[in-house]
């Protein structure tokens, strides 16, 4: 569930190093539990789920939801189970709200119970035992396999509705999972189009950022360090060349950044106030929850100038604790100069987030500039 892409540079990697962009593939939401079928009132078939990461729960109610993930099937070699991707591209679930008449506190800070209130409705059943194995039958039908072949799955709910351009001038992107698939899209698009770079270009898409990154495919692992060393080894280099390459390298950790909210401006820092469509955001923190320093910021600003992109700054209010991202985590495994940046966005961790179309275009151009530098 992680992806690392690279393009070998024309110059020796020990002399030019790596130009790296890091992002993450996961987003907050709901994961379907094993044997998830639950029957209510002898007729409503629900799915038992658990919360993944930190979604804004209220935004998941009354939305048409689809199901996607991966399914593990039987194989001849038990050490290599057959893995199939599954995407049920239709709205098969919904988490219905309770009417305000039955929940008068709905508009007064109602906190949903994660085990009770957020279970999605899948179907109506007509027979008492019909719910047993219902999801397994659905998976088998979608993958065109026998139900007995299914051993396990990693399945998640997601919003079925597609993203769209909104605003009077269509200047905003409204979509699910902007955090952080927007950075993944920009990075993959850039590295697929790079031609004969001098330095070796790398795009690292980690999983599990929303739950701490401490997995073998997360940023808090040896994944990036091992891939970079293997690239050096494939170029007939050794450990010394690897360490020299790291010293000449640069990482852009690209993740969402908080823009000033139009209705809650007081939540932002008094002087650092990023806006949508006003440039990419350089993120800073005295606690080092972001990797940015003056030197790495100077490099990024010059890349933006070359790409014709603007920059803004984000710092948390001093009386509010902020989040972090993959930058500081990956820096503990590879000693490379690093900066944390992102698209300014609103409604982060909502089922549907908002960013500026100009900023996403700028992100792509700046990453292209990095890869050609």
How should these model regions be labeled?
Residues 1-373:
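N-terminal hydrophobic/helix-forming segments and targeting peptides
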């Amino acid at each position: 569930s992680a992806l690392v892409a690279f393009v070998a540079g024309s110059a020796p990697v020990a002399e030019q190093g790596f130009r790296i962009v890091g992002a993450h593939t996961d987003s907050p939401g709901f994961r379907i539990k094993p044997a998830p079928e639950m029957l209510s009132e002898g007729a409503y078939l629900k799915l038992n789920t658990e919360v993944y990461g930190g979604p804004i729960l209220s935004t998941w109610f009354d939305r048409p939801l689809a199901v996607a993930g991966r399914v593990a099937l039987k194989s001849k070699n038990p050490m290599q189970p057959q893995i199939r991707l599954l995407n049920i591209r239709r709205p098969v679930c919904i988490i219905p709200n309770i009417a305000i008449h039955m929940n008068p506190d709905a508009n007064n800070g109602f906190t949903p119970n994660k085990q009770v209130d957020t279970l999605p409705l899948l179907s109506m059943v007509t027979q008492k035992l019909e719910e047993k194995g219902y999801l397994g039958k659905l998976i088998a039908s979608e993958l065109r396999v026998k139900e007995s072949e299914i051993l396990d799955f990693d399945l998640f709910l997601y919003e079925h509705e597609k993203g769209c351009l909104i605003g009077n001038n269509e200047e905003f992107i409204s979509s699910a999972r902007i955090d952080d698939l927007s950075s993944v899209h920009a990075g993959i698009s850039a590295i697929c189009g790079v031609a004969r770079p001098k330095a070796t270009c790398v795009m690292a898409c980690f999983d599990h950022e929303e739950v701490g990154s401490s997995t073998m495919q997360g940023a808090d692992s040896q994944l990036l360090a091992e891939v970079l060393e293997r690239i050096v080894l494939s170029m007939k280099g050794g450990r010394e060349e690897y360490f020299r390459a790291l010293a000449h390298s640069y990482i852009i950790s690209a993740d969402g950044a908080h823009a000033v909210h139009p209705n809650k401006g007081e939540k932002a820092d008094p002087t650092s106030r990023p806006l949508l469509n006003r440039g990419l955001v350089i993120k800073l923190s005295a606690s080092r929850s972001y990797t940015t320093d003056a030197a790495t910021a100077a490099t990024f600003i010059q890349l933006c100038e070359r790409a014709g992109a603007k920059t803004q700054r984000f710092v948390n209010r001093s009386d509010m604790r902020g989040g972090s991202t993959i930058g500081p985590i990956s820096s503990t495994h590879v000693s490379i100069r690093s900066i944390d940046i992102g698209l300014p966005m609103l409604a982060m961790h909502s089922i549907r987030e908002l960013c500026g179309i100009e900023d996403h275009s700028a992100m792509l151009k700046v990453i292209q500039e990095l890869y050609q530098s």
